[in-house]
Amino acid sequence: MPIKIPDTLPAFETLVQEGVRVMTETLAIRQDIRPLQIGLLNLMPNKIKTELQMARLVGASPLQVELSLIRIGGHKAKNTSEDHLLAFYQTWEEVKHRKFDGFIITGAPIELLPYEDVTYWPEMQEILDWTETNVHSTMNVCWGAMAAVYHFHGVPKYELKEKAFGVYRHRNLKPSSIYLNGFSDNFEVPVSRWTEVRRADIEKSESLEILMESSEMGVCLVHEKRGRRLYMFNHVEYDSTSLSDEYFRDVNAGVPIKMPHNYFPHNDPALAPQNRWRSHAHLLFGNWINEIYQTTPFDVEEIGTDL
């Protein structure tokens, strides 16, 4: 089954061209199926690019998915027009009465700030608490993952001496995990962050388990043993050119930045990078969506009573 998104969303045509099955609202109504309700809390400045990245992965599932785009109410986006936000987004205040089968919280370029100094931290805490009663399963990504694991488990973040930046080998630590079904023993994942969480702090919580890790970059994916929260600290959703875009953005702005590790062919920025993580990104999100489908209540309004 395809993903249901507005026909006029910029990602629509791109997804069609890529072979992702997308569905208009008219066609969705004709199918007698309850679509999985997936919310995307998009905290990134370039919301359109992030919409496409996440819709691409969620939409690859054989299940019908309805994606709702959500933003922080009082926060003004720097790189996305107000017209786009008004046309396609709802604020969390506008959707907090709803129940969601799945909910994605993205990263945000604010990781060097203490959590309490983030202007929308109080609302973020409300949203995280709300997910416990209104969301069946949550996928937290990069800063969203760090914020969530700090909020729920007190796991701190640490500033790195230099940006973790590139494509790194990671190990599958639990092949029997439902979320890692079909994963290789080791694989590559894009990394782009200024902070990290550490294994020792994760291990202090009996309810957390590390599923993916890199000998160079540390913890990558964590899940809750008795819950339905995933914490992805890196960027499996990235496009082939995402790291390149970040690199040249900083170079052109005169910001000191090292070339992304293990990314450009022959370490030559003039050569187009190859995507070596796409299949595992689809596996992770596909496994997540499938697990939601297997465990979520048939009546979406019963979410929160099933824990």
Swiss-Prot record:
GO molecular function, one term: homoserine O-succinyltransferase activity
Residues annotated as site: Important for substrate specificity: 192
Keyword Transferase: yes
GO cellular component term, pick one: cytoplasm
Biochemical pathway: Amino-acid biosynthesis; L-methionine biosynthesis via de novo pathway; O-acetyl-L-homoserine from L-homoserine: step 1/1
Pfam families given in the database record: HTS (PF04204)
CDD domains assigned to the protein according to its UniProt record, in alphabetical order: GATase1_HTS (cd03131)
Location relative to the cell: Cytoplasm
Entry superkingdom: Bacteria
Catalytic activity: L-homoserine + acetyl-CoA = O-acetyl-L-homoserine + CoA
SUPFAM superfamilies, per the entry: Class I glutamine amidotransferase-like
Function: Transfers an acetyl group from acetyl-CoA to L-homoserine, forming acetyl-L-homoserine.
Similarity annotation: Belongs to the MetA family.
PANTHER family registered for this protein in UniProt: HOMOSERINE O-SUCCINYLTRANSFERASE
Descriptive protein name: Homoserine O-acetyltransferase
Source organism per UniProt: Rhizobium johnstonii (strain DSM 114642 / LMG 32736 / 3841) (Rhizobium leguminosarum bv. viciae)
Gene: metAA
